[in-house]
Design a protein with these regions (language model features):
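Helicase-associated low-complexity/disordered flanking segments
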Residues: 1-82
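Pre-Walker A adenine-sensing motif
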Residues: 79-94
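Walker A/P-loop
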Residues: 97-115
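Walker A/P-loop NTP-binding motif
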Residues: 113-126
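Conserved Walker A/P-loop ATP-binding site and its immediately adjacent core
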Residues: 130-151
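Conserved nucleic-acid-binding Ia/Ib motif block in the N-terminal RecA-like helicase ATPase lobe
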Residues: 145-176
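Conserved small/polar residues in nucleotide/adenosyl-binding loops
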Residues: 177-186
């Protein structure tokens, strides 16, 4: 019996939501190779024995936002104006990065689709490839994981690549350091 596959229809309101988030960073240069020195206990093993010492201790992260406060706020004002939203007086970050963005969508409108597509667009336009999705419950976590699995072929068709994802296990955080290795830049 053939496997049932979902066919996703691109909705204009979803595209507008993605464009709004991506537009916040208009003017950000494309940079896909931001490196840093990893500060973890690293030991040679079967997964990294071929790497040089330099590669072994080098990690990969998204490039820092190069836009200044004024550029970001101008971009946000432009998007708020386009969406008939009251203009923000200032950027809000809560100490987590340069600014916090709030995308509000009704239940059942495709929020998960929107943020996965947003990740692909941020990768395409700015080279960013590391994203963290935080969810409030196990049930939602399972649904998000299933969405990533279900939408892989759909996004492969549009972007020519698949999202590599995993569910974080706080009982074994060291097992995720491999994601910062040079071989995991997608």
């Amino acid at each position: 019996m053939a496997e049932m596959k979902f066919k996703f229809t691109i909705q204009p309101y979803q595209t507008e939501a993605v464009d709004s988030v991506v537009g916040v960073f208009a003017g950000q240069p494309f940079n896909e190779h931001f490196t840093y020195r990893r500060d973890v206990e690293i030991k040679r093993d079967v997964t990294n024995w071929m790497l040089s010492d330099e590669e072994l201790y080098m990690g990969f992260a998204n490039a820092k936002v190069q836009l200044d406060y004024g550029q970001l706020l101008d971009n946000i004002h432009r998007i708020q104006g386009r969406n008939n939203i009251k203009l923000s007086d200032s950027l809000k970050s809560g100490g987590l990065g340069v600014c916090s963005l709030d995308v509000e969508m009704e239940t059942g409108t495709g929020k998960t689709y929107v943020y996965i597509k947003t990740m692909f667009e941020l990768n395409k336009l700015y080279g960013w490839s590391k994203f963290i999705v935080v969810v409030p419950s196990i049930a939602i976590r399972e649904g998000v994981q299933k969405s990533f699995e279900t939408m892989q072929e759909h996004f492969m068709e549009y972007y020519g690549k698949k999202a590599r994802f995993f569910v974080y296990n706080s009982k074994n955080p060291v097992s995720y350091t491999h994601l910062t290795l040079p071989t995991n830049r997608e």
